[in-house]
Regions:
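A short helix-loop-beta-strand connector motif used in the catalytic cores of GNAT acetyltransferases and
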Residues: 21-34
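Acyl-donor (CoA/ACP) binding surface of acyl/acetyltransferases
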Residues: 32-158
Length: 158
């Protein structure tokens, strides 16, 4: 999960405004989701699965962003869990990875709550806002999430 240190702006507060965001996921290696409130359909954030690899890997990398005004209410916990479930059940993935800056306590708490395990540290991992940033690498598998995906024959290595 590459958590971008940016909050969503008012211009991105409708589904229509997210069309550009969603269009970039119209390829087999990426999927994008908008996290909305159930009652009002107000957008509270977005989640994406990038670098989807098939064959013997069956994996992807998560990214997300949220409105600062909606943090601490469990919306991203629920939204991210739904995307994780979708990745394991609907997409048949086996593993999801999250890369998080070490000082991003909110994001670290989120993945810990969802059952991710810390796997390592990547120095100068991603170029953000003019600087190379270190990241911690976290991951979860379908078994760890107790959502076992059943691969189809077409998903198996040849």
């Amino acid at each position: 999960m590459n958590y971008w240190r940016r909050t969503l702006g008012a211009r991105e507060s409708t589904v229509e405004a997210f069309e550009g965001y969603l269009k970039r996921f119209e390829q087999p290696t990426q999927e994008g989701f908008v996290v909305c409130l159930r009652d009002t359909a107000a957008i509270v954030g977005g989640v994406n699965i990038n670098n989807i690899a098939r064959g013997s890997l069956q994996s992807g990398t998560l990214g997300y962003t949220a409105y600062a005004s909606t943090t601490g209410r469990g919306y991203m916990t629920e939204g991210l869990w739904l995307v994780i479930r979708h990745a394991f059940v609907e997409l048949g993935l086996h593993r999801l990875e999250a890369n998080i800056q070490p000082d991003n306590i909110t994001s670290l708490n989120l993945v810990t709550r969802l059952g991710f395990q810390r796997e390592g540290y990547s120095a100068a991992f991603q170029f953000i806002n003019g600087e190379w940033r270190d990241h911690e690498r976290w991951a979860i598998t379908a078994e760890m999430a107790d959502i076992a995906a059943q691969p189809t024959n077409q998903d198996q290595p040849r």
